Amino acid sequence: MKKPLFVLFCCLSATLVVPESFAQRFVRRSLDRACVQTAQLDSELTDTTLYPTSLDRAGALELKSIRSWVSGFFPGTLWLLYGETQDPSWLWRARRRTAALAGLSSYERTHDLGFMVGCPVGLGLRLTGDKAYERLLVETSETLLKRFDPKVGLIRSWDNKNRQPDPYLVIIDNMMNLEMLFEASRLTGDPRFRDVAV
């Protein structure tokens, strides 16, 4: 009786040792490559108030100011790499790039605060529990509420640049604010953020 149980145990144990699959290798290699490329890009960006957006036709890196709607993408990428690797160098990079975004917490001229601040700060809060990120997320959400019109029930996307009467401009990018607003409501217990989100 002991021998058949031992054989069964050995067979089951052998099935638990699974070699790395093609998909697992692909993911690991992709993450390794992303780390190399992102570290190189970060080392080339000496001004923490400029953010990479794309390459021009000649292949040169295009940078935008902190007020660009994509300013949170690069810090968000750094947070994601830290979350996957737990490498302290990614934590340092993510904190440094996210710190520059703090000035956006009172920037009232955009609806893109979820892209710009919510994503990287939300990731920083989730991965570190840092109360400074909690405050920044709530302050930014307060600013975003200033764009909400209760008569319309929406957050205005764009301001009217020529000061002429126009329709209330709303685009799907506003959906990127929902997670930040829900989180602000959860953190503060203030239902206003949630009410605007729904």
Set out the residue ranges of the language-model regions.
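Bacterial N-terminal signal peptides
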Residues: 7-15, 98
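Positively charged n-region of N-terminal signal peptides that target proteins for export
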Residues: 1-4
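Bacterial Sec-dependent signal peptides at the C-terminal "C-region" and cleavage site
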Residues: 12-25
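Glycan-recognition and catalytic cores of secretory/periplasmic carbohydrate-active enzymes
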Residues: 22-198
